[in-house]
Curated annotation (Swiss-Prot):
Stretches in topological domain Cytoplasmic: 1-64, 118-246, 295-643, 694-709, 786-797, 848-961
Region (Interaction with 14-3-3 proteins): 959-961
Presence of keyword Chloroplast: no
Protein name, per record: ATPase 7, plasma membrane-type
Record note on quaternary structure: Binds to 14-3-3 proteins. The binding is induced by phosphorylation of Thr-960. Binding to 14-3-3 proteins activates the H(+)-ATPase.
Membrane topology label: Multi-pass membrane protein
Pfam families, per the entry: Cation_ATPase_N (PF00690), E1-E2_ATPase (PF00122), Hydrolase (PF00702)
Keywords assigned: ATP-binding, Hydrogen ion transport, Ion transport, Magnesium, Membrane, Metal-binding, Nucleotide-binding, Phosphoprotein, Translocase, Transmembrane, Transmembrane helix, Transport
Gene: AHA7
Length: 961
């Protein structure tokens, strides 16, 4: 039997690879522990396929038609059926042109939605490809990082802490693993997997490191077989609920208008059947914001692409709106606020064991480090050697214990040149100290050294050593000796202080969450200007803390927490959410996953584990806090575009329904349905550009405020409807425009209205005039709703302006020159066209003040702050007490010499000025320190601080005067 034929037997699952001995697994899979060659991989990919589940292929036709299947489209489809099925009689031909127009409008919206979503889907697929799970496998005799989708049965893979198991596999020699199988079996606790056991695709490694041989991939895995049994659930997010609420409001408004028209037309006016149908069609076609789902989804998709360009990949689209409302960010210190580029000052190493010097301590620490797949600490330690190979020179490695959150240390068991067994371990000082046989004797000195390091912003790394006389690799060995404490320095990022200040001005409170000591956290907070109001994780356990306040208040007011474990992160997020905060949380490890899932916005930082990425909403591809704050601003801009459009959509619904209903009720004026279609089509073309509009993000956290959206929309829409009625009255009932502008007189009292031909002629001209008035001011409204302050001072996007000008040029030409009997309009000439533009300009001038009045009524803000535009004129919500935070931050920055007074960070030159001030403050401090060191007092104090002596304590016996 050839190798291929033998492997084909595996695909039929006639061999139980989960239960046969591991040696037989290699025989059946025709592989060795040296892995596969590239040719073997290609053959197996052809046979087994890629390591991914089968994707359901969606029909493009059904997907296209799906954009016509929503409540707003149903109303338009009902209008189309009315036009073709009910609009007959009354001495008029069948309403085919209206039917065709409605279908064209539906097709235009569906086409735009289909194309944009397809483009967004392709872009999203490309972005998500960056997040595709990776796996370390032996190929052609070398370890390589490959896409997990390229794994095949027979591959040798490495599994370590934080990895999501990429395929079903059997474990080889090594230490037991702790595997979280909750996603597969529902087991809440991790299970122990010994060498030889099976691990399944989709589970997570919680502890340990080992090699394994892949036995099944793709649809043949345990997860793949169960996937088809799981029904996908439809989750209705907050964004969808908002869309539904706005859509329902518009539909209800139309229903009310139609009910009034039915009662008046058929009950009071006793008019014909066809007249009523045409008037109802006007409300149905013009009132429905048919483009709303398209505009909002396209806006969000384009926004997600921009976020990705800034280094923040959005896994869940609705996370954008939550990011816009985030008011508290719980940030890791290491790698986010700091560079995560550790260095060790050899001169400061404190040695505790006789016979060991600092060079030997460094060598021992390097032995307890990995030479490959190093973390930041391992890199810092090994880089201190002249040659990294020195770490293993003259010894034989027997067993390496990798770091895990449970023991917080690494260890190496090895044989020296004489064949004696030794073990060396490095890790968290408390863990190392607990192992020492003489911990009670050295405890005070160790803690004093740790505190001395912490006061200088240095982390401590403990180092211990033991002999293993019995020669048992897994035995306990002899007593542990505490060898040394190594100081680790992780410098803050150059932009962290400025970014934190920027966040405070944006209403986002940044809290430092770190596993380091409290003194280190406070020193880092002081350097970054974020405050030193920090607490140990023990203060989270009960309300009996030294501050005498509840834990909730403590968390809300704290600048950060030190000595934090992953479970503390979860508790912090939970309590902040209970205080009505929208909370973001950064994380990178497997144990951060619960907190990332719990947070409103889980943010996996650069180089996070697969488990952390899987639990997050946003994945960063660049390090640092500035990426997050930039993403916040971008999210607010995206959210602002969506909110601007929803206000516009509600306004247009009200102005169409109310305006044409009043004309019908009081003047029996019948506006042609086809011209409403023209308005809708031109509006759609213009409004689509709002997804790329230039907007000013909210200076404070923002969220959906339906009360504001509906109130602003109703008032603005009602105003425009009333102005349409005023225009109609002035043109149809008076000589006002004729006398002032010397244009053709449309006053009905100057015509023989009993003559049907004359009346029809006048009505067609009035329809053309009303069409231009409604079209122009309706589209101009978007410039009002898109701006936070005066619309003429916030420059709109180029595409929006061009689209508006083209649409209104078309509308003006139609009104001035078009004679369309089928559409019920007749040309009014360029004179009347100019008059209507002047009327609409005057109408437009009152829109901004009305917008301010509505927001003033909703928020209660003073007039000065209202028109200033910097507070968004929206209902004020206590987003983490932003005034208190901003005042506190200013005070702290002033104390540190970083700022001389109030200066908003969003001024154009503020970034440069802040950098200059920071450099100047740093230079002044350095000059003062150097001068002080030249004095006897300065030298004594400097030496005392270095030794850990307290000169302020008169009872101290560490020195004499």
């Amino acid at each position: 039997m050839t190798d291929i034929e033998a492997l084909k037997a595996i695909t039929t699952e006639s061999i139980d690879l989960e239960n046969v001995p591991v040696e037989e697994v290699f025989q059946h899979l025709k592989c060795t522990k040296e892995g596969l060659t590239s040719n073997e991989v290609q053959e197996r990919l052809t046979l087994f396929g890629y390591n991914k589940l089968e994707e359901k292929k969606e029909s493009k036709i059904l997907k296209f038609l799906g954009f016509m299947w929503n409540p707003l489209s149903w109303v338009m489809e009902a209008a189309a059926l009315m036009a073709i099925g009910l609009a007959h009689g009354g001495g008029k031909p069948a309403d085919y042109h209206d039917f065709v127009g409605i279908v064209v409008l539906l097709l235009i919206n569906s086409t735009i939605s289909f194309v944009e979503e397809n483009n967004a889907g392709n872009a999203a697929a490309a972005l998500m490809a960056q997040l595709a799970p990776k796996a370390k496998a032996v190929r052609d005799g070398k370890w390589n990082e490959i896409d997990a989708a390229e794994l095949v049965p027979g591959d040798i893979v490495s599994i370590k802490l934080g990895d999501i198991i990429p395929a079903d596999a059997r474990l080889l020699e090594g230490d037991p693993l702790k595997i979280d199988q909750a996603t597969l079996t529902g087991e809440s606790l991790p299970v122990t997997k010994n060498p030889g056991a099976s691990v399944y695709s989709g589970s997570t490694c919680k502890q340990g490191e080992i090699e394994a041989v892949v036995i099944a991939t793709g649809v043949h895995t345990f997860f793949g077989k169960a996937a088809h049994l799981v029904d996908s659930t439809t989750h209705v997010g907050h964004f969808q609920k908002v869309l539904t609420a706005i859509g329902n409001f518009c539909i209800c408004s139309i229903a009310v208008g139609m009910a009034i028209e039915i009662v008046v037309i058929y009950g009071l006016q006793k008019r014909g059947y066809r007249v009523g149908i045409d008037n109802l069609l006007v409300l149905l076609i013009g009132g429905i914001p048919i483009a709303m789902p398209t505009v909002l989804s396209v806006t969000m998709a384009i926004g997600a692409h921009r976020l990705a360009q800034q280094g923040a990949i959005t896994k869940r689209m609705t996370a954008i709106e939550e990011m816009a409302g985030m008011d508290v960010l719980c940030s890791d210190k290491t790698g986010t606020l700091t560079l995560n580029k550790l260095s060790v000052d050899k001169n400061l190493i404190e040695v505790f064991k006789r016979g060991i010097d600092r060079d030997m301590a460094v060598l021992m620490a390097a032995r307890a480090a990995r030479l490959e797949n190093q973390d930041a600490i391992d890199t810092a330690i090994v880089s201190m050697l002249s040659d990294p190979k020195e770490a293993r020179a003259g010894i034989k490695e027997l067993h390496f214990l990798p770091f895990s959150p449970a023991n917080r240390r690494t260890a190496l068991t090895y044989l020296d040149g004489e064949g004696k067994m030794h073990r060396v371990s490095k890790g968290a000082p408390e863990e190392i100290l607990d192992m020492a046989h003489n911990k009670l004797e050295i405890k005070e000195k160790v803690h004093a050294t740790i505190d001395k390091f912490a006061e200088r912003g240095l982390r401590s790394l403990g180092l211990a050593y033991q002999e293993v006389p019995d020669g048992d690799v897994k035995g306990e060995g002899g007593p542990w000796d505490f060898v040394a404490l190594l100081p680790l320095f992780d410098p803050p990022r150059h932009d962290s202080a400025q970014t934190i200040e920027r966040a405070l001005h944006l209403g986002v409170s940044v809290k430092m969450i770190t596993g380091d000591q409290l003194a280190i956290a406070k020193e880092t907070g002081r350097r970054l200007g974020m405050g030193t109001n920090m607490y140990p994780s023990s203060s989270l356990l009960s309300d009996n803390n030294t501050e005498g306040v509840s834990v909730d208040e403590l968390i809300e007011n704290a600048d950060g927490f030190a000595g934090v474990f992953p479970e503390h992160k979860y508790e912090i997020v939970k309590r902040l959410q209970s205080r009505k905060h929208i909370c973001g949380m950064t994380g990178d490890g497997v144990n951060d996953a619960p907190a990332l899932k719990k947070a409103d916005i889980g943010i996996a930082v650069d180089d996070a584990t697969d488990a952390a990425r899987g639990a997050s909403d946003i994945v960063l591809t660049e390090p640092g806090l500035s990426v997050i704050i930039s993403a916040v601003l971008t999210s607010r801009a995206i959210f602002q575009r969506m909110k601007n459009y929803t206000i516009y959509a509600v306004s247009i619904t009200i102005r169409i329904v109310m305006g044409f209903m009043l004309l019908c009720v009081f003047w029996e004026f019948d506006f042609p349905p086809f011209m409403v279609l023209v308005i809708a089509i031109l509006n759609d073309g213009t409004i689509m550009t709002i997804s790329k509009d230039r907007v000013k993000p909210s200076p404070t956290p923002d969220c959906w405020k339906l009360k504001e959206i509906f109130a602003t929309g109703v008032v603005l829409g009602a105003y425009l409807a009333i102005m349409t009625v005023v225009f109609f009255w002035a043109a149809y009932e008076t000589n006002f425009f004729h006398n002032i502008f010397h244009v053709r007189n449309f006053n009905q009292h100057h015509f023989k209205m009993k003559d049907k031909k004359v009346a029809a002629h006048l009505n067609e001209q009035m329809a053309s005039a009303v069409y231009l008035q409604v079209s122009t001011i309706s589209q101009a409204l978007i410039f009002v709703t898109r701006s936070r302050s005066w619309s003429f001072v916030e420059r709109p996007g180029f595409l929006l302006v061009i689209a508006f000008l083209i649409a209104q040029l078309v509308a003006s030409v139609i009104s001035a020159m078009a004679n369309w009997p089928f559409a019920g309009i007749r040309s009014i000439g360029w004179g009347w066209t100019g008059v209507i533009w002047i009327f609409n300009i005057v109408t437009y001038m009152l829109l901004d003040p009305i917008k301010f009045l509505v927001r003033y009524a909703l928020s209660g803000k003073s007039w000065d702050r209202m028109v200033e535009g910097r507070t968004a004129l929206t209902g004020k919500k206590n987003f983490g007490q932003e005034e208190r935070m901003a005042a506190w931050a200013t005070e702290k920055r002033t104390q540190h010499g970083l700022e001389t007074g109030q200066k908003p960070v969003y001024e154009r030159n503020s970034a440069t000025e802040l950098n200059n001030m920071a450099e100047e403050a740093k230079r002044r401090a350095e000059i003062a320190r150097m001068r002080e060191l030249q004095t006897l007092k300065g030298k004594v104090e400097s030496a005392a601080k270095l030794k850990g002596y307290d000169l302020e304590d008169p009872n101290s016996n560490n020195y004499t005067i």
